[in-house]
């Protein structure tokens, strides 16, 4: 008897999930970078100065808008804490445990974990200039990167891009590095884009300015991960990393057009319940068998809904 296939948590979509959230993500990235560009004390001083000017010019009534907004926000969160209002921070969260697996070309899933190889590409930048993200050269470099991501996403089936998740570092008080973890179908796709016209245009620009702009740092790391040598697990999580990717598929019941499949499947499948199973490692199984009862409790079938 054939082993049961992995159970997907969603159906194929007409467009990749990440493209549906592109506008909101862009806004969030800009907001995060701007907030990170100055220390908290600097932001408080800016706010205090502006409020002081407003009071001096228009009187103490100018304190009212700030008081109203703060009261609303505090009250809104208290209502969510007490359960009198839906917790909007849980929107999009997948409850229980799930894992990201590569679907077949028809959108179905087999029963073998990590059945395909992947390319993980880390790319980032940092500005070591007093202006931080407002430095003109750094802004130009950032604009090039944003445009390249849009180009990759616009024709992801050809470019081989599966998904990307942006991050901001926290090693410094301000102007931390910005990094994106990107996933590609194969190294050939990544290499082909690297030698394409737009990326080469960006490389040419970098070659022109790098000598005179030592304050702008860029880097990337590439990892080619063979099949059976990677694993993922998420609990009570919104899609992120590989789980936020989208794979081009052509379902048998479709009309021949490309659709996009989320890689997320129920982790309660016997082959997915532990890291040893997900990464196909007999070496690790001996360690995990000692604590099998503890692992099993984290997969309680009555724990919660598997999808939002």
Task: Name these PLM-found stretches.
Residues 114-116, 175, 181, 211-214:
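Residue-level signal for the start and early helices of compact helical domains
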């Amino acid at each position: 008897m054939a082993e049961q296939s992995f159970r997907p948590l969603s159906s194929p979509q007409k467009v990749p999930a990440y493209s549906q959230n592109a506008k909101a993500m862009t806004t969030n990235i800009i907001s995060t970078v701007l907030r990170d560009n100055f220390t908290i004390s600097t932001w408080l001083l800016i706010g205090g100065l502006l409020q002081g000017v407003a009071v001096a010019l228009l009187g103490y009534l100018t304190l009212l808008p700030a008081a109203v907004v703060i009261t609303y926000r505090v009250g809104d969160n208290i209502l969510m804490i007490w359960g009198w209002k839906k917790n909007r921070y849980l929107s999009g969260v997948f409850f229980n445990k799930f894992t990201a697996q590569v679907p077949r070309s028809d959108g179905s899933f087999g029963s073998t974990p990590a059945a395909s190889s992947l390319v993980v590409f880390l790319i980032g930048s940092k500005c070591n200039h007093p202006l931080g993200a407002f430095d003109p050269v750094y802004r130009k470099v950032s604009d090039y990167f944003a445009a390249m991501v849009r180009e990759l996403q616009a024709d992801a089936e050809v470019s081989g891009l599966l998904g990307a998740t942006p991050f901001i570092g926290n090693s410094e008080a301000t102007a931390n590095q910005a990094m994106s973890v990107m996933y590609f179908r194969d190294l050939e796709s990544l290499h082909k884009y690297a030698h394409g016209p737009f990326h080469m245009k960006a490389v040419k620009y970098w070659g022109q300015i790098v000598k005179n702009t030592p304050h702008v740092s860029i880097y990337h790391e590439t990892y080619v991960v063979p099949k059976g040598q990677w694993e993922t697990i998420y609990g009570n999580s919104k899609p992120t990393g590989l789980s936020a990717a989208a794979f081009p598929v052509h379902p048998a019941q479709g009309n021949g057009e490309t659709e996009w499949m989320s890689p997320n499947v129920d982790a309660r499948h016997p082959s997915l319940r532990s890291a040893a199973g997900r990464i196909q490692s007999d070496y690790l199984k001996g360690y995990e068998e000692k604590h099998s009862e503890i692992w099993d409790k984290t997969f309680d079938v009555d724990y919660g809904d598997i999808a939002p």
